[in-house]
Amino acid sequence: RTSQQECQGILEMQGDCGIIVRVNCASISDMRGTIMVKIDLITGFLGAGKTTFIKEYASYLLRQGLNIGILENDFGAVNVDMMLLQELQGEKCELEMISGGCDKETHRRRFKTKLISMAMCGYDRVIVEPSGIYDVDEFFDGLREEPLDRWYEIGSVITIVDAGLEENLSDQAEYLLGSEAADAGVIVLSRLDKDNACEEQENRIISHVNR
C-alpha cells in the first residue's frame, strides 16, 4: 500500500480542464544522451480521467522538446481516446493503437509487438495506458523480458483517482485500487471541487487508499 507520506504528494486535476500537472520529470534534461526509452504507465479506473491527463502530460513533455509516442489500448471497448488525442499528433508526437484481438493473450502479444516497433522510432518517452490487458506488476515483468529489456526502462507510474470515488467499492475494485496505488510514484486526483473541500477530498482519498 502507498504510505501516508507518499500520498501527501497527490496532485490536482480540477474539473475536466485546467489540470495542474506537477509530475517530476527531473530526468528529462539527461534523457537525450541515453539509449533506453522511458516508458510511463498511466493507470486508473474507467472514467477516472486518464485520457484527459495523458493529453495534458503529453503536451507538457512536448513543450520540453521531447519526442514522444503514445500507445492506446482499445481492448474490450470502442476506442474514443484516440480521437481525443489526435491534436497532439505531429513531428514530435505519434499515436499508436492496439486494436482487435479476440482474447487477452492475443491482445498482449500485439501489445508487445507494437512496443518492439516503437522502440526503434527514436522516442525519448513512451506513454502507455495498459488497463484491461495488464496490471502494473505484469507490465513490469513484460518489460524485463527479451527484447523489451534492451530498449525500455520504467519512467513515471501515475495513477488517476476520481476525487468523488465511492467509499463502498467491490472487493475486486478495492484490490485494484490498492494495487495501482502501491505501484504508483504519483497519484493524481481528478475532478476536485474548485471552490471548496479540496483538502477534505484529498484526505478522504488518502485515507481510503491507506486503509
Language-model features and meaning:
Residues 12-14, 32:
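Position-driven detector of the extreme protein N-terminus
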Residues 130, 160-164, 186-204:
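G-domain G4 guanine-recognition motif of GTPases
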Residues 120, 178-181:
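A short, aliphatic-rich alpha-helical micro-motif
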Residues 5-7, 14:
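Cationic, low-complexity basic patches in intrinsically disordered or flexible, solvent-exposed regions
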Residues 69, 153-161, 181-192, 211:
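Conserved beta-strand/loop subsegment of P-loop NTPase cores
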Residues 19, 23-33:
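Short, positively charged and aromatic/hydrophobic N-terminal segments
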Residues 172-176:
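Charged helix-capping and loop-helix junction motifs
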Residues 37-43, 48, 52-170:
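Nucleotide-state-sensitive switch-loop elements of NTP-binding domains
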